[in-house]
Curated annotation (Swiss-Prot):
Cofactors named for this entry: FAD
Substrates-to-products reaction catalysed: UDP-N-acetyl-alpha-D-muramate + NADP(+) = UDP-N-acetyl-3-O-(1-carboxyvinyl)-alpha-D-glucosamine + NADPH + H(+)
Primary location class: cytoplasm
Gene name of the record: murB
UniProt name for this protein: UDP-N-acetylenolpyruvoylglucosamine reductase
Matching NCBIfam families: murB, PRK13905.1
GO molecular function terms noted in the UniProt entry: FAD binding; UDP-N-acetylmuramate dehydrogenase activity
Matches recorded under InterPro entries: FAD-bd_PCMH, FAD-bd_PCMH-like_sf, FAD-bd_PCMH_sub1, FAD-bd_PCMH_sub2, MurB, MurB_C, MurB_C_sf, Oxid_FAD_bind_N
Lineage, top ranks: Bacteria, Bacillati, Bacillota, Bacillota incertae sedis, Caldicellulosiruptorales
Stated family: Belongs to the MurB family.
Keyword annotations: Cell cycle, Cell division, Cell shape, Cell wall biogenesis/degradation, Cytoplasm, FAD, Flavoprotein, NADP, Oxidoreductase, Peptidoglycan synthesis
Active site (UniProt): 171, 223 (proton donor), 293
GO biological process: cell division; cell wall organization; peptidoglycan biosynthetic process; regulation of cell shape
Gene3D superfamilies, A to Z: 3.30.465.10, UDP-N-acetylenolpyruvoylglucosamine reductase, C-terminal domain, Uridine Diphospho-n-acetylenolpyruvylglucosamine Reductase, domain 2
Species this protein is from: Caldicellulosiruptor saccharolyticus (strain ATCC 43494 / DSM 8903 / Tp8T 6331)
Length: 310
């Protein structure tokens, strides 16, 4: 096939017909026709040119820590950025490629006495994913430290966006609105003062809290739902009596109801059914429609709940 030959000619690493469950933190998902691993921005651009010329479906992902992949897999190319992982620190600025693990960038910042990214040390996603969804925890968000980014548009033009250009809001950025691909981001941090809790201590404290409150022993995609205004998804789910509720081997965690965990070989459709049931139950009990925070890849039989389907 033209796409495959193009990758081989450019010496770009790829896998063929491999299950995506091996690449997601949920450990769920069928096969992708291709999984492609660009090592730098030039390779990423060449891959996108090839998928456009070949007319095949494509999707860019990072660490797949916030996604549910269909049991049917993905009939096209999954482009994963995890090998685009260079970052550098200049005084209180950190510039990181999209595939860097945000946890590693954050830990390095903390070790260097820089504060602002302590909340991200336990987040399992990439810089690209963190900026895309304005990731956050413990009353902090990526937008708080975001300085600027280089992005790629549909016509393969590279340009810079500043903080005000990104239209950040809760778990949202301009990257979700437009077909823009983040290539690298720069974060502006602050030097910790003598009277401050050392950043690495604060980061370690946050991680300890995560271990105590989150079901980290099971595969998951993190928080399944966005926080509804004035409330918490996990509390509403727990108050609806759904802790421990399961469909197949997908289960609402008994430790933290905001998580759905994979107890072993769970199917994506099990998770979708569980999401639907959770949305429906919470809406009928409290009148609140929970909106998924995770991304969906591929085709699903089970719909998401809508108020009109009540």
């Amino acid at each position: 096939m033209k796409f495959e030959r193009g990758l081989e000619k450019l010496n770009i690493e790829f896998l063929k017909d491999k299950p995506l469950k091996d690449f997601t933190t949920f450990k769920i998902g069928g096969k992708a026709r291709y999984i492609v691993f660009p090592k730098n921005i030039d390779e990423l651009i060449e891959i996108i040119k090839l998928v456009k010329e070949s007319g095949i479906n494509w999707r860019i992902v990072g660490n797949c820590s916030n996604v549910l992949v269909s049991d049917k897999g993905f009939d096209g190319a999954i482009i994963t950025t995890t090998k685009m992982d260079f970052f550098k620190t200049e005084e209180n600025l950190i510039e990181a490629e999209c595939g860097c693990m945000i946890s590693q960038v954050a830990r390095k910042a903390c070790e260097n006495g820089l504060k602002g990214l302590e909340f991200a040390v336990g987040i399992p996603g990439t810089v690209g994913g963190a900026v895309y969804m304005n990731a956050g925890a413990y009353d902090s968000e990526i937008k708080d430290v975001f300085e600027c980014a280089e992005v790629l548009d549909e016509d393969l033009n590279i340009f810079k966006l500043g903080k005000s250009d990104m239209r950040f809001s809760y778990r949202h950025s301009r990257l979700k609105e437009e077909k823009l691909i983040l290539l690298k981001a720069t974060f502006r941090l602050q030097y910790a003062r003598e009277e401050d809790v050392p950043p690495i201590e604060k980061a370690n404290e946050y991680n300890q809290r995560r271990r105590e409150k989150q079901p980290l022993q099971y595969p998951s995609a993190g928080s399944i739902f966005k926080r509804p205004p004035g409330n918490f998804a996990g509390k509403l789910i727990e108050d609806a009596g759904l802790k421990g509720y399961r469909v197949g081997n997908a289960c609402i965690s008994g430790k933290h109801a905001g998580f759905i965990v994979n107890l072993g070989d769970a199917l994506a459709e099990d998770v979708r059914k569980l999401i639907y049931h959770t949305q429906k139950s919470v809406y009928e009990k409290f009148g609140v429609l929970l909106e998924p925070e995770i991304e969906f890849i591929g085709e699903f039989e089970t719909p998401l709940f809508e108020m009109s389907t009540k």
